[in-house]
């Protein structure tokens, strides 16, 4: 069995607890469905947000989603000055590390913009 990475990203309409939780759960549900994942398959999840999101941790949404035993980590994306014109506001990103026998090519990433 190997560990594979699955990336996902979405944006949220506002910096509020409800918006962050709703957007994060929607993202995780899509990734879990597209990749046929159960919480036991997930070795860890690393969430990042753009610095304009501070109302809630995406990991708190993952706990509400049922990932109580999954190791989770949150952080902010680096504020690289040259990237500011290209960066998405209110963006939530996740890197899932999953235990699987499937090849990397079988993993399905997700990007969604509100």
Label every PLM stretch briefly:
Residues 1-114:
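Terminal domain-initiation and capping elements
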């Amino acid at each position: 069995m190997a560990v594979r990475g699955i990336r996902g990203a979405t944006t949220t309409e506002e910096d509020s607890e409800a918006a962050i939780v709703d957007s994060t759960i929607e993202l995780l549900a899509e990734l879990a469905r597209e990749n046929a994942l159960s919480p036991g398959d997930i070795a860890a999840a690393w969430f990042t947000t753009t610095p304009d999101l501070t109302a809630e941790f995406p990991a708190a949404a993952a706990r509400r989603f049922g990932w109580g035993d999954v190791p989770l980590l949150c952080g902010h994306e680096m504020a690289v000055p040259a990237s500011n014109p290209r960066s998405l506001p209110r963006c939530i990103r996740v890197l899932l590390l999953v235990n699987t026998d499937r090849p990397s090519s079988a993993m399905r990433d997700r990007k969604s913009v509100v």
